[in-house]
Amino acid sequence: MRYDPSLIEKKWQEFWKEHKSFKANEADDKPKYYVLDMFPYPSGAGLHVGHLIGYTATDIVARYKRAKGFSVLHPMGWDSFGLPAEQYAVRTGTHPRETTQKNIENFRKQLSAMGFSYDEGREFATSDPEYYRWTQKLFLLLYEKGLAYMADMAVNYCPELGTVLSNEEVENGLSIEGGYPVERRMLRQWILRITAYSDQLLEGLEGLDWPENVKQLQRNWIGKSEGALVRFKVNNQNFLEVFTTRPDTLCGVSFLVIAPEHPEVGQLIAEDRREEVEAYICRAQSKSERDRISESKIKSGVFTGTYAKHPITGADIPIWVSDYVILGYGSGVVMGVPAHDERDREFAETFSLPIYEVLDTDGYCIHSNHGDFLLDGLWGREAQDYVIAYLQKKNLGESKVAYKLRDWLFSRQRYWGEPIPIIHFEDGTCRPLEDDELPLLPPEIQDYRPEGFGQGPLAKVKEWVDIHDKKTNRQGRRETHTMPQWAGSCWYYLRFCDALNSQAPWSNEKEKYWMPVDLYIGGAEHAVLHLLYSRFWHRVFYDAGMVSTPEPFKKLINQGLVLATSYRIPGKGYVYPEDAHEDNGVWMSTSGEELEVRQEKMSKSKLNGVDPQILIEEFGADALRMYAMFSGPLDKNKLWCNQGVSGCRRFLNRFYELVTSSLVQDIDDPKGMYLAHRLVHRVGEDIEKMSLNTIPSSFMEFINEFVKLDIYPKSALAMVVRALAPIAPHISEELWTILGNAPGIDQAGWPEVDPKYLEDTSVTFVIQVNGKLRARLDISKNAAREEVLSLAREAVSRYLEDKEVKKEIFVPNRLVNFVL
């Protein structure tokens, strides 16, 4: 029999679909396991093999847990709102819905070809009205709890894209999407009050089985700092409040720096300095916050011409404006202590400001006694507490906790996003839509370009925007901003628990059964924002009594990047691998230009993506799945090599030939059972530990040992086929039936490992005739002498035929020698 994956894989994919083999059920008599991928944005480029690493890992776990008797939820859906589809609509006039649906169909086809065991009945897209009806409802929950509000904000506005961008979507003054110029402008926006949950989001990290670097990134993003708020008197009447985490260095202050957007900055500018300062502020407004706080940026600033009084020494402290200070953190004013802060030192040296040493090399306070302020000799927490107590007594400050985390700018000036379900009235009030008014659908439009600054495409459709509100009998105006792509992905994991519910986003019963997500796998690029936003929404739901767990994701794994060889003409761009060739050790393009050859992240832009469909057609999905794991540890970067897929295909060919061999018999063989039980034990342990890259090697080692047997015990191979099923499910299903079992290997369960077989109880006897090696036999260690001699005579019978055996030499567990 010949192994033909093109026939086998199609056959079993149709079987699984017909029998709904992976439908998840809430079974009270089974433990549950919820394994989830970070669902993809369905781009026009489709999937490359780099995307499949995480999907293959979750599928292996899902199939393994089903076999172990768990009720498994393993769904897939589509994060389908987003800017690329809208930009394509602007260029072509094609409705984003059409583009998105076409892309989803392509993604679905690619994933299906891999044999992933998704519960297809739970699939949805965030752009489905049946889904975003509930996204709108959940936004209104935030609104009702005072966690969604409108405010005038300095935003990153991209005229070319016609929308506001988050700080993470801007780099070096340009949009990451398209590389267009970005400006800072004031705009009235919807904001989510994520800062209300700062402490809960911090504390919740402690109990999570997440990579420590991800938890640290979130801690840093939230940025909790304990310190003091210090008041510096300005113009003998007003105070400028400064937050510091190091009040013990207060006497080392030689300047103050205020953020350009601080509301009091205008009052601090001396008239003879106004033109220069305002010009600087104007320039600062064109920069993104990321660019402003970059460590590598040369410090810039301008003196306001105004001084503040030091609260301890009474010295005049110059007030400067600099764009490295951000209004949203602390008070928007920092005290410059250049002797003990590297950033302050750079600023002081740039502008020739004084530097005062107030800590010795061991951190003890020096040069800090002034009148009744006696700080010298104190250290660390004791020194800080002394300063705070002194300031409180003099009404010049108090202790304070500050956070870097700022409220979440939520609205976007786009068409392809969830409409925000709010009606505004002329008197400044607004009304949230009621349940019977949801989902609020966007109007059908022909022109997807923005209306102008602060107005998305929806603002053009006057008949949709301007309405008579029947609920209040008033003239109103619909909100024309839409939600960001983050909105739909903040809660999708909950919808999968109850995807067909038309009465609520999920039922309490099903949420309680499935949550939390037991294993969540996705890219490290989502380490902060998606995970933080999802945790925030989940905490709100928890406080509202809507979910049973305070945290959504129990265990998180970030899969590593998949690298592939890229070829680039310096100064021009990338070329396809098929347009590159090596000539005397130098890589050249077909146009005759020398190439830079690198190992880079697989991506469409670098022309080094590998289409999985091509590999499936050549080698089969099972070989691709196996190599996807064999290529390296799940959480590490790995270099892709198509030859590795070919190697896995050769292994599967060999395994297929082994199981279908005429040597397979219904016998009990200790060595064969030992090899099978040892393999199953190893594979189970490796899946539990997520050491998936070592599994293919274990199977290869098994085959190399197993083929040495004279007869292949069928029961041992049945165990091994079941153990292979999570990794290579199609060939396993086929071989399972060839061995005489009913279809549906998942239902057969995970093979039980008998501890007695984990120790190799067989030994290899050397069988000699007149001292010459004639055979080797694997025989049980416990076999009696006569049993061994009987087996040995049978093995070398042709050498003994018609001969007289004069002597039988027997060495236990080692040797039999027949002397003629």
Swiss-Prot record:
ATP binds at K604. It catalyses: tRNA(Leu) + L-leucine + ATP = L-leucyl-tRNA(Leu) + AMP + diphosphate. GO terms for cellular component: cytosol. Keywords: Aminoacyl-tRNA synthetase, ATP-binding, Cytoplasm, Ligase, Nucleotide-binding, Protein biosynthesis. A motif ('HIGH' region) lies at residues 40-51. GO terms for molecular function: aminoacyl-tRNA deacylase activity; ATP binding; leucine-tRNA ligase activity. It is found in: Cytoplasm. It is an enzyme of class 6 (ligase). A motif ('KMSKS' region) lies at residues 601-605. Pfam families: Anticodon_1, tRNA-synt_1_2, tRNA-synt_1g. Its EC number is 6.1.1.4. NCBIfam families: leuS_bact. Belongs to the class-I aminoacyl-tRNA synthetase family. This is Leucine--tRNA ligase.
